Amino acid sequence: MWTPRAPPPRPALLFLLLLLLRVTHGLFPDEPPPLSVAPRDYLSHYPVFVGSGPGRLTPAEGAEDLNIQRVLRVNRTLFIGDRDNLYQVELEPSTSTELRYQRKLTWRSNPSDIDVCRMKGKQEGECRNFVKVLLLRDESTLFVCGSNAFNPICANYSMDTLQLLGDNISGMARCPYDPKHANVALFSDGMLFTATVTDFLAIDAVIYRSLGDRPTLRTVKHDSKWFKEPYFVHAVEWGSHVYFFFREIAMEFNYLEKVVVSRVARVCKNDVGGSPRVLEKQWTSFLKARLNCSVPGDSHFYFNVLQAVTGVVSLGGRPVILAVFSTPSNSIPGSAVCAFDMNQVAAVFEGRFREQKSPESIWTPVPEDQVPRPRPGCCAAPGMQYNASNALPDEILNFVKTHPLMDEAVPSLGHSPWIVRTLIRHQLTRVAVDVGAGPWGNQTIVFLGSEVGTVLKFLVKPNASVSGTTGPSIFLEEFETYRPDRCGRSSSAGEWGQRLLSLELDAASGGLLAAFPRCVVRVPVARCQLYSGCMKNCIGSQDPYCGWAPDGSCIFLRPGTSATFEQDVSGASTSGLGDCTGLLRASLSDDRAGLVSVNLLVTSSVAAFVVGAVVSGFSVGWFVGLRERRELARRKDKEAILAHGGSEAVLSVSRLGERRGTGTGGRGGAGGGPGGPPEALLAPLMQNGWTKAALLHGGPHDLDSGLLPTPEQTPLPQKRLPTTHPHAHALGPRAWDHSHALLSASASTSLLLLAHTRAPEQPPVPTESGPESRLCAPRSCRASHPGDFPLTPHASPDRRRVVSAPTGPLDSSSVGDDLPGPWSPPATSSLRRPGPHGPPTAALRRTHTFNSGEARPGGHRPRRHAPADSTHLLPCGTGERTAPPVP
């Protein structure tokens, strides 16, 4: 019998949850909240550019929304590259909340280029001229490239007047075709270095050098060892090389499917290409290495997706770049900031190479004795063994062509990230750094921008004496930069309109320039006025831009200020400064714009999994138990039906019929006890082919017990013995087999219409049949004339019907001859007719199951021979066949 399983003890489940919580807490240490959060109402005070011109407070009526692509700051002037337009905006301090352009250049695609673009299947909004390259070529010239309806074009413009200088030139390999594609570009020594795609389908990625006095060079075309779906992020010039930062699919991890890694590649400025045989008009100095930004441990946790890179800055006397990395979109959300020393970057390019000997093999380091000399990737120059790169031996050029990847990765300073943030909603994608913050210019502030314009401000303290490690970074402030009232609401602009394009520091004005597709917002780097009136809040903010003045105000401190102030960026105790009503940290840190720690995310996921597993276990157990309970109840019902009638194990049909006639229903009385009426008890016993409705809907005494199966009616099968005796009355015990043969022969030539009529019930009358005595069947089951026999129910194909064979003499008094027979056998019938005074040849003997009923009243007269009921031997159909009586 099924018994429900006991639920697991609750203390064990709680202990498991607490253990998992502690493990996740150890894996993802909780991150401190910001010391302050700027109120959102301060956004309305930030100046914003939305395309307004001189003398206009708002853009002209009917003007399109901006679609900004590039922003370039040159001294106190900001150039904004838009769709079909180029704006010049002055950044002089102003009390106005509106930034207006002083000059505007309209640069649209010509109709023929638009028509060709539309013919290529592009949308009308894509067939425009999007400014994708915006550079300062010299002190007075701007170099601008636009997508020009998927036919890139470049031109030079005067920086002061925005007038065209010279003719337009092709933008192929200088500017992407699609405005959604990433690209980088810079000028170095009068030469343009670009990283983009060179075709309409964006398949051929390239690092390209053009303009200047040196030949144009490019990377090897369609070689996955050089590039595999790169996404270019930034480019910097340092020493005799130009460094390109990008991310791509790593070919060295091709056995792990698509793994994105961050790279840095470099080329020599003075490279002139290879020989006519190898690498002609292609880079001979191109090498690339992996950038390693990971959390150390037994198994490093990598931040592989490069998002943004700063220029080369000096930190502690070292040339350093800061880069923002994030996790892949299908991983735990998180971002990190790592710093890289350019000297270490250069050292990696002097290390070992990595190679793949066959397409199926893994990548392995190249032994040093197999590296040719001079070293591949070096910058050939006058005074060296080879004066130019095109003079290098083919062995070196071939090695460079097939071995562009370095074996070692570039380590980050301190071998760990300087800043790690785990965000649930938006990753960090932009970075700006101020290495001269504070009144003495000796503090480093890092601004990190998220995808939707939220900026996080950190104070970092590099320690140059200990391998470039940094102490714990201090999360100073969190503030918003996107103005929905001017740049568009999130519902209308969507994620695209709120995407942060660039974040640039304007140290002269003490602000940040945050560019979005529809606007540019200038945000102050600090909000010191929030702490005015409370010395503890001002000093406790640890903000290098803020100081406490003697007049009781918190003021903004510019580099080199001569004002008197108090400041403590080391985070010393402020307990002696008294308390302030409404401490800012407590009042403003509650709302963190949806930034959720990974601790909560992982803990919730684990808890949901455990609870779901427990609930699922209980549910499965309950359903299994329910099925067992139903099966047990079904067995009990069957036993109750079979055991109906008290202590008797089985009720025969005749006994049940007698109880019906007498009105006793067993334990419960006449159909009123627990057993219910006999019809209800007998209905479940009916098998396929028996009409239960006819049984249950009959009259109170219409139950024919002869129609129901009983154990007496289904004896074991009897073996039939062959016989050839022509006289049935002399066969004795073998008459059954002989009658079966006769019935089979008759059934093939005759069709008998069965007629079954019911007669009123009469009391049973004893009758004599030779030496035996029995009770005749009721009228409903007796033959009214020699051709009528009891009707038997239609048999199911699965039902086995066996009746007892006749063994005694035939009772001639049981059949009347007053009615004519409906069927006469042929004269050749093998059944003999009895003489006027002869006895019957056989007696129809019924089992006691057929004796429940009443006999037909009247005298007993000699009758013709009647065969036994052998209908079970005939085939089933719409009507059953019965052996005819002997005339």
Curated annotation (Swiss-Prot):
Compartments, record wording: Cell membrane
Ranges per topology, Cytoplasmic: 627-887
Compositionally skewed regions (Gly residues) per UniProt: 662-674
Entry-linked PROSITE patterns: SEMA
GO BP term, example: positive regulation of cell migration
Free-text function comment from the UniProt entry: Functions as a cell surface repellent for mossy fibers of developing neurons in the hippocampus where it plays a role in axon guidance. May function through the PLXNA4 receptor expressed by mossy cell axons.
PANTHER family on file: SEMAPHORIN, SEMAPHORIN-6B
Name this polypeptide is given: Semaphorin-6B
Organismal lineage: Eukaryota, Metazoa, Chordata, Craniata, Vertebrata
